[in-house]
Amino acid sequence: MRDSIMQMCELCGKLTDKLYKVIIEGSEMNVCKECAKFGKSPKTYSRLGKKTIIGKGTITTNKQVKKPIKRRRDIFDTLPMLREDYGDVIREAREKRGLSIEELAKKLKMKASTLQKFERYELEPNEKEIKILEKELKISLTESIGEETSYYGGRDEDGFTLGDFIKIKK
């Protein structure tokens, strides 16, 4: 009698002695007979499509032709962010003009306590307040987030990976 090795289906996890290689959602997988119906045979599947040669030209007829993938732009890449040192910038600009908190608050039509909270980092100004402060004090409280803050992958020597948090049951 022949001993067969039981293998696990990559889709449902069922143990079986025969696996079928199929393409499911663009990924090649080894699956059981029941799950094989959800995929296409790698022999018939083509990412580029079927080509029909007519004379000197080649025409692609399959609808599975993929367009080049463009990098999606994140809306947060272009939004201005409040500077980390906004409180010091506000205080220094106010002191440079020789104004007290109460005098500046009166000019800005703002509460003195609100202005104090900005300077002590207890409260962050909203967009409207940022514009008012920037215009009156002739300062910049925002900075643009550029591509340099994007993460492109790779392992950070000090950082964690998902594998550091996964517990595997045996």
From Swiss-Prot:
Pfam family, any one: HTH_3
Signal peptide interval: none
Keyword DNA-binding in annotation: yes
CDD domains: HTH_XRE
Superkingdom in the source lineage: Archaea
Keyword list, A-Z: DNA-binding, Transcription, Transcription regulation
Domain HTH cro/C1-type span(s) in chain numbering: 90-144
Listed transmembrane segments: none
DNA-binding region: 101-120
UniProt GO MF annotations: DNA binding
NCBIfam families tied to this protein: multiprotein bridging factor aMBF1
Protein name as it appears in the record: Uncharacterized HTH-type transcriptional regulator MJ0586
Protein's organism: Methanocaldococcus jannaschii (strain ATCC 43067 / DSM 2661 / JAL-1 / JCM 10045 / NBRC 100440)
